[in-house]
Amino acid sequence: MAISIKKRFSCLLKISGTLAAILVTLPGLGQLPVLPTVPSPNAASLGQYGQIPVSNYTGTASVEIPIYTIEDTKLTIPVTLSYHTGGNRLESHPGWVGLGWNMNTGGAITRIMNRLPDELDAPTLPKSGFYYTHGDIDQTDWSSDANMKLPPPLRDIEPDIFTFNFLGMSGKFFLDEKGNWQVQSDQPLKVIFSPGDFLTPFISKYGYAFSAYLTPTFRKFTIIDQQGNQYIFGDTENAIEYSDDIAPKTGTAGAAFFATSWFLTKIIPAGGGSPVVYTYERGPYVSSLYVSTSLTSINGYWKEVLAPGCSSWTQSISTSGKVISPVYLKSISNPDRNIKINFSFSASHELTYKDADYNKIALERYGGVTRDYLKILQRLPAIIPYYRQNDEMALYRRFVWFKLDKVSVTDTLSRQIREVRFNYTDTSISRLELKALSFFSPGGSQPVQTYSFEYNTTKLPDYLASLGDHWGYHNNTAAPFNNQILNYEQLKAPSEGYTKARILEKITYPTGGTSNFEYNLHSYGSIVSNDRRSLVAQTGNASGLRVSKIRSTDAAGQTLTKEYFYVKNYTPSANPATLASSGILDTKPQYNFSVSGIDVGGAGFNYSMFSSSTVIPLAQNTSGISVGYSEVVERRSDGSYTIYQFTNHDNGYKDTAVVNSYNNTYTPAIPFTSYEFARGKPLRTTSYTATGSPVQMQQYSYAFVGSPWQ
């Protein structure tokens, strides 16, 4: 039986293609790779679920445990605990429910900042963000050679990307060249921001020494769904997260204190009814550190850097990072349903950075003399409840990560309906890890249901141990800086055994049944070319994990096994190990590059660079997907199987190159127009008997909603 299903792509408009092509010089030359926008661990884990689909396309399994659901005739609001099976990156800090886990309670909008924040309006750069400057590129000659030669403006010419994930809806939105908010999502959604509705960061109210340099941020965004329900993000002071440079340069303190995430605060049902209200508490600061090394060399005359006939050679080894001001969900309430869900949390004792890591930053940035900026941020106890209660903590101990201890469901008279408690491995020598989840009945002292979890026994190293592969997963191999010419890329190769470190391997359910998970590294049969125009035939392994087998056993001992093969042209008689991988690697790791060109003054130059971080982001998309699979086989215990086929680079969904650039020579920083949003969609799902006879097929077709950029 064949079923044809038609679906629609919602898409970005021409602005994405426009901005991708505005290259006025060779961007980023002479700089270390820029640290991306760093949200809190909770916002990052929430965003991971919205951006990296749990699907065969990415090799990830759906692992979800229901906690509670608020239901009425207008809205269904589930609270669930979910796990992401893609692997544990070494420098990604666990969220408040432990490594790999995420508490799906409401949702958030998280910003991917492109160059400058859209709302930038600071004394040194007044009204310079894209919110104010979008009209600069609303012109017909934006891609002319003359404009390509203009020096980089101090005004922003590229919008930030805002990703969202809430209650089963996910996508992105951004501001276009006419000042309209454009949405990219599989659901028909509308984004509203009220002009002029800005909020000065919270620290300005409490004696912050650099308040004059703060830029007001977007106060709130409203997303409206097809039914007319309104979802409000931000709006209140304690529902917006911020980050700042942990060690700003002299004279720039406070200038980079920007909003990174806006959390869901209210749901207003269409047609009336009481809103669902989310309340938050601002937690103590947390940090995210990184180490980068680079070598750069310039020869010839480059007007903006060198005098005629000069050359430059620079080596840089740097430790830096971000200080983040997170918020934590306190409660969800809905008067119409007489329900309130309370979230109780406390400081964890988990592994974090060493004092020596922070001292190294202080030594490099301040000469080891002062750490005044951190003191200013952290010695404002009126701002953060935890600091009011623990005001005498040592400076670096004031970076504190919370863990969720308990979820209690009560009625509006505080009578308990359900309680869920979380049990962790919580020690200073390991990352926070969820051991068990227990449900209690009202007034009960013993759990009525318990889920327990077991993980791969390989240990993860300390933070900043520099034992990661190309993609940031564990490979237990140091890559010393002096090896950069000979074998740096080989030293960064993935290791399947170490990539599996502390990955979830077993769930035991309250019924006594179990699920066991097996994994292997990603594989690929082709690579997207650096200019994004074509595919290059090349095989290999990429890091991160894909599920290879799931074995589920019930309390009676009955077992169901599912195996997954990420290959092309599978048949029952074929050995999957001999078949070609259907995986496409988004970006090949690259640590060196050289380029020759003409500067804006007409003089020639040669430029080369080595970086300990890849000079091209891995991957070249906002979701972080390194490999996507065009075809995946799911084989069951009885030999029957299903083949899933997906949209990908190789079947009509390539990215497109820039319209124009100055110096038409490839450099890693050249942007492109992304069709990432259109990849990973089902094309065909076909079920077969164990002998290979088809029994059912579903075929999907898609159409763009609006006008795709062309």
Place the predicted regions along the sequence by residue.
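N-terminal secretory signal peptides that target proteins for export/translocation
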Residues: 1-11
